[in-house]
Amino acid sequence: MRWRLNLSSNQIVLAFSVFALAVFNSHYWQYMAAHAPFGEGHNWLLWLTMPFFLLACLNFLIQLTFWPYVHKVWIPLLLVLGAGASYAVMTQNIYFNADMIQNIIQTNPGEAKSWLAPRFVGWVLLTGVLPAALYLWLVRVRYAKRWYQEIGWRLASMAASVLVVALVAATAYGNYASFFRNNKGINHQITPVNFIGASIKTAYNVYDANRPLVQIGLDAKRTSAQGERKKVFILVVGETTRAENWGLNGYARQTTPQLAALGSEVINFPQVSSCGTATAISVPCLFSRMNRGDYNGNRAAHEEGLMDILQRADIYTSWRENDGGCKGACDRIKHVNVHDWAPKNECVSEGCWDIHLLTGLQREIDAMPGDGVIVLHTIGSHGPSYYQRYPQAFRKFTPTCDTNQIQQCDRQALINTYDNTVLYADHVLAETIKLLQNDTQVDSALWYFSDHGESLGEKGMYLHGAPYMIAPSQQTHIPMVFWASPGFYQHSGLNQTCLRDHAGQQTYSHD
C-alpha cells in the first residue's frame, strides 16, 4: 500500500495515550467535574495538571510493552479491551479491580450474553475494532537506524514521563492526595490502566494459587443421640438482594408479604453485612473459615470449607444450583443444576425461576439417611436483566424496566422491577417453609441470606462489585431470615425468644 503513516514508536505510544484518555475516559472527566468543580478552591490546579499527569503515567506504562512485532497484537488488543471496559465504566459505573477481573473470568455464557446489547456492540466496534483495524492497516513503525538509538529515544520518553509526574507531585501533591483520598477507588475507572493493573494482579493470584488442597476439621463428627428425629437444614443463598428493599426491614413497600404473614415464626435480622460485593468473593468467603478482613480467594480455593466438614461428619450434604456455579464451595459434595429439570420456557441462559429449586426437594429429604444440610443457590435479583427473574404473576410494581440496558430506564421503573424480584424471592422462601412445615417426620430449619446487595443508580452506580472500602451500603447491607419447626427448636436446644432478641439488637456478617 502506497499511503501509510510512518510514525516513530514514541509518536505511536503518545497518540494511543491521548486517544485512550480522550475517548475511553469521558466518565472519569465527568466524575472530576462533579466532585472537583473547576471553580472551587484550588481545583483549577487539579484540572490544569491532571491531563498531563495521566498522560505521563499511561505513556510510561505503554512504553514498557511496546516492542517490535508485539505491538501489532498489543495495541489492537488494548483498543478493543479498552472500548469494552470504558463502556462498562460509562454505563454501569463499574470499578475494574482484581475482584472484578475474577468476576468476569467466572462469568458464564448466559451472563455474558446479557451484555451483548446493540449499544455495547456499536461502541466497541466504533472505538475499539475500527481504530485497531486502521492501526494494523495504515500505521508503520519508523524505528531509529541503530538499536541503541531506538532504546535511547524510548528511555528519553519514559524519563520525560517521570519528570512530568515529579513536577505535578511538587506543585499539586496536596490537591491529588485530597482528591484520591476523598474519591477512593476512582483509579479503578481510569481505562486502560484499570484493567491492565487488575489483570496483572489476577495473574499473580493465579500463579500463587498452585498449591494442594488443605484439609481442615479432620476431627469433625456427629453428636446426635440414638433414636433422635432426623433433622434437615435448608440454607438458601440469595443473589443480589439488598436490605434496603426488604419488606421485613421496614421498606416503604411490602416486598415480603408472605414471610410477614408467617409472623413470629420468621426471625428477621435487619443489620447484616456481606463478605464481598460480588458472588465470586462472597460465596467462597461465607463457606470458608476466613473472615472478610483476611479473606484470600486463592486460599479459599485450596482449603476445605463448611460443606466438606459436614460431609466428613457423616451429615448428608447437597447443593442445588441456579446461579451459574457455587464458586468452589460445593466442588467435593453432591451438586445438581436446576437447568437439568426446569421447563425451558421458564429459564433464560443465566438461570431459571427459583421456584424450580424445590422440584424433587421433598423426595431428597425423604431419602436422606440421617441429618442433612441442603443448599439452594438462587438467582434471586441478579441483574441487569431483573425483569427475567420472576413470572408475570409477580409483576406487581409497574411500570417496569424490561431491558438489560438499565441505565436507560426511568429510575422508578428500575426500582419497580427490582422490587418485583424481591417479591418473588419472598414467595420462593415462603413456599420452601411451607414444604418443611408439611413434613411432620423431620425437624427442619431454613436460613436465608443474600450473597451481596445491588446499586440501582444511587450516585450513578449500578449493579455490584465495587471495592469494599468504597462500596455503598446498598451493595453490602443484605437481608437475612431464619425459620425453624417447633421440633427443631426443642431438639437442638435453640431458644427462639433469645434468638429473636439478638437478631433485632446486634449486627452480623457472613463471617
Ranges and model annotations:
Residues 3, 11-13, 24-124, 129-511:
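Catalytic domains that recognize anionic headgroups
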Residues 17-20:
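Membrane-embedded alpha-helical bundles of multi-pass transporters
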